């Protein structure tokens, strides 16, 4: 070949691929981008843009700083990692696979397929290493705040000089969408106030969302916003420069008094020659042609889902993770020798078991509650239950959305964490959504049983976080007071009508509407002993009488429904009621008994538990052919279709319109909630 021909051939040859850190050809990030592209392409749906844009951020964090052990995803002192922008799920699946978790390549090939371990958005319990279910934007960030609160509080409660058994960080990835959601304001404002120095957030500032360039609708000065919250803000980090990222992470780790936001300027879909930086990469496959071009640009000449062993070796965290956990195990053993009682308590709380003292404490509280038979509002009954049970539940970490003295969530021994880092009470401020999503993070972290509180009518603000509690099966307790038109003068803006029925629509959420002090205490017992889902308490503002019961009836409370008062003679009708309307049902039954219509009263504090009973158990409450009249101060639709009764049909007395502003005494008769009106409905049903 002549010199001229050789020069021409050299000019036509592809340029050598730069494989240095930060370059497209860096094998560490090329593997992440390739797996993200391949997974979305094979599924024919998904979001490749964020994983491709955050590859360098992920590489620096996961390879150099994240303390975790792929062989034991539940190691108590692991760092927590949350992908708040959960649509970019192929990023976390690729990270978990490459670092050595039990997530084989076959599962990445089944991305978004039925019964795979790689669902469209990360789901708790589906994939080892996934700390929380994310997808509803902003909530992962709030979960991370909750995890950081739990870490800080647990450390204050259990660490001893020279023996720190709780010492880990919470890292969270988030995007523009997370920051546009209001829950991010609620959670991050509180995080700054609480000085969560072990919380580090990475902001993927790529300027793109589904509709295009976010500058048209999200021009906020995000760094200034977070500085105002009291965060440590690291600005203008090139999200594709490993050296800058490394410096930023080290600066974040050196800040112990404030949470840190690292603002990373990135390009969505980085590496895709014709699509990077464009909204098309956000939520759709790149296509075979674009993927081929991207592979060429990265110098990635491997087949789809193929990763060479030498690149796996660059990612493998099993040895370093095992060493870190081994060091913690040694520290834990020393702690057990020095503080055996505290060590046993620590392990119990992380396991989620109730204390050995709980059963006896509850039994004593139940005996006292039955004997006192106090006439109080059920919100007060809840406070009494808290006070009685709290000494045996040191893992309580609860609070209210600026309504502690209305929801009655304070109790003897409640200490705000702002005054004592080892406390057990959180003043959340008016942040219902943030409060509830933070509580999910506290529950997910382990070591605590969170409870939160607001007015029932404002549960709408918290609803999606409540749904996430149920979806993830987390033991979070929601105290929702001022439950009906019974709160009176505040009017329809504050009088819940549809809310109880709406909450009952959420799968795996136990909704309790107790009638008195005994049912309220039993509801607390049921919620605390339930480990696979949340519970909501619907509580009255007005005082309610305490009903006499025998042991079998008390046991029936936690079954969800039971005969509170049997008819004199064979029942010709059944009145079923909840909460404050049990009192009304009893008064109506008195009128009916006098009129020669024997009427059974069934109290149904938890419809979800009633519906879980066997057909035989349900039939024992509602005999076949006996008319049933349901009474509840809310919408009637759910009662009309109540499953499990053997009645031919149910007549529901409720409120199917909004309330009125007036004294309570004027509202009940206005809406037909009188003994006479209920008795008349039963008479019509009996015929």
UniProtKB/Swiss-Prot annotation:
Binds 1 thiamine pyrophosphate per subunit. GO terms for biological process: pentose-phosphate shunt. The record marks 47, 282 as: Important for catalytic activity. SUPFAM superfamilies: Thiamin diphosphate-binding fold (THDP-binding) (SSF52518), TK C-terminal domain-like (SSF52922). It comes from the Bacteria. GO terms for molecular function: metal ion binding; transketolase activity. The active site is at residue 432. InterPro entries: THDP-binding (IPR029061), Transketo_C/PFOR_II (IPR009014), Transketolase-like_C_2 (IPR055152), Transketolase-like_Pyr-bd (IPR005475), Transketolase_bac-like (IPR005478), Transketolase_CS (IPR049557), Transketolase_fam (IPR033247), Transketolase_N (IPR005474). Its cofactor is Mg(2+); thiamine diphosphate. Substrate binds at residues 47, 282, 379, 406, 482, 490, 494, 541. Thiamine diphosphate binds at residues 87, 135-137, 177, 206, 282, 458. Activity is increased sixfold following autotrophic growth on methanol compared with that of heterotrophically grown cells. Catalyzes the transfer of a two-carbon ketol group from a ketose donor to an aldose acceptor, via a covalent intermediate with the cofactor thiamine pyrophosphate. This is Transketolase 2.
């Amino acid at each position: 070949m002549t010199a001229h021909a050789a020069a021409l051939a050299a000019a036509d040859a592809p340029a050598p691929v730069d494989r240095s850190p930060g370059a497209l050809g860096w094998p560490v990030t090329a593997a992440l981008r390739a797996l993200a592209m391949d997974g979305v392409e094979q599924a024919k749906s998904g979001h490749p843009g964020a994983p491709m844009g955050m590859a360098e951020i992920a590489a620096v964090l996961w390879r150099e700083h994240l303390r975790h052990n792929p062989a034991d995803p539940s190691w108590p002192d692991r760092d927590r990692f949350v992908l708040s922008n959960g649509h970019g799920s192929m990023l976390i699946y690729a990270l978990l696979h490459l670092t050595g978790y039990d997530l084989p390549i076959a599962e990445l090939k089944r991305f978004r397929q039925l019964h795979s371990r790689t669902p469209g958005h990360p789901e708790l319990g589906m994939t080892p290493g996934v700390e929380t279910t994310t997808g509803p934007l902003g909530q992962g960030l709030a979960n991370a705040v909750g995890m950081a609160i739990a870490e800080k509080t647990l450390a204050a409660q259990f660490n001893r000089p020279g023996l720190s058994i709780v010492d880990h960080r919470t890292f969270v990835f988030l995007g523009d969408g997370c920051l546009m959601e209001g829950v991010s304001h609620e959670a991050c404002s509180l995080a700054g106030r609480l000085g969560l120095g072990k919380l580090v957030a990475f902001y993927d500032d790529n300027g793109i969302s589904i509709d295009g360039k976010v500058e048209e609708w999200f021009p906020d000065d995000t760094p200034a916003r977070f500085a105002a919250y009291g965060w440590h803000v690291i600005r203008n980090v090139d999200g594709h420069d490993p050296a800058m990222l490394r410096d930023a992470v080290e600066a974040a780790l050196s800040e112990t008094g404030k949470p840190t936001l690292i603002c990373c300027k990135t390009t969505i879909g980085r590496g895709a020659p014709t699509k990077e930086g464009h909204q098309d990469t956000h939520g759709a496959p790149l296509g075979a042609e674009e993927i081929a071009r991207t592979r060429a640009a990265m110098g990635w000449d491997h087949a789809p889902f193929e990763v060479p062993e030498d690149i796996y070796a660059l990612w493998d965290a099993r040895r370093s993770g095992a060493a870190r956990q081994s060091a913690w195990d040694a520290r834990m053993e020393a702690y057990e020798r020095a503080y055996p009682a505290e060590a046993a308590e620590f392990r119990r709380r992380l396991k989620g078991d109730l204390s050995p003292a709980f059963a006896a404490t509850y039994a004593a509280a139940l005996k006292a509650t039955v004997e006192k038979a106090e006439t109080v509002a059920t919100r007060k009954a809840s406070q009494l239950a808290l006070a009685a049970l709290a000494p045996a539940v040191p893992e309580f970490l609860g609070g209210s959305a600026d309504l502690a003295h209305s929801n009655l969530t304070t109790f003897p021994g409640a200490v705000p964490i702002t005054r004592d880092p080892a406390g057990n009470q959180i003043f959340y401020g008016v942040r219902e959504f943030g409060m509830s999503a933070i509580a999910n993070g506290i529950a997910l972290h382990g070591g605590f049983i969170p409870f939160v509180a607001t007015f029932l009518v404002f549960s709408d603000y918290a609803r999606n976080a409540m749904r996430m509690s149920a979806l993830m099966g987390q033991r979070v307790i929601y105290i929702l007071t001022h439950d009906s038109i019974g709160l009176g003068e505040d009017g329809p803006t504050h009088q819940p009508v549809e809310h109880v029925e709406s909450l009952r629509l959420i799968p795996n959420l136990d909704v309790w509407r107790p009638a008195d002090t005994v049912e309220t205490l039993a509801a607390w017992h049921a919620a605390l002993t339930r480990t696979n889902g949340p519970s909501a308490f619907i509580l009255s503002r007005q005082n309610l009488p305490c009903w006499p019961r025998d042991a079998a009836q008390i046991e029936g409370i936690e079954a969800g429904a039971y005969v509170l008062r049997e008819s004199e003679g064979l029942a010709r009708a059944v009145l079923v009621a909840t909460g404050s309307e049990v009192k009304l049902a009893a008064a109506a039954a008195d009128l009916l008994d006098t009129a020669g219509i024997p009427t059974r009263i069934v109290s149904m504090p938890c419809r979800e538990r009633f519906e879980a009973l066997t057909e035989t158990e349900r039939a024992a409450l509602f005999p076949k052919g006996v008319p049933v009249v349901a009474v509840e101060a809310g919408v009637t639709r759910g009662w009309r279709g109540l499953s499990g009764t053997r009645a031919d049909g149910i007549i529901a007395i409720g409120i199917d319109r909004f309330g009125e502003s007036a004294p309570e005494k004027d509202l009940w008769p206005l809406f037909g909630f009188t003994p006479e009106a209920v008795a008349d409905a039963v008479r019509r049903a009996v015929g």
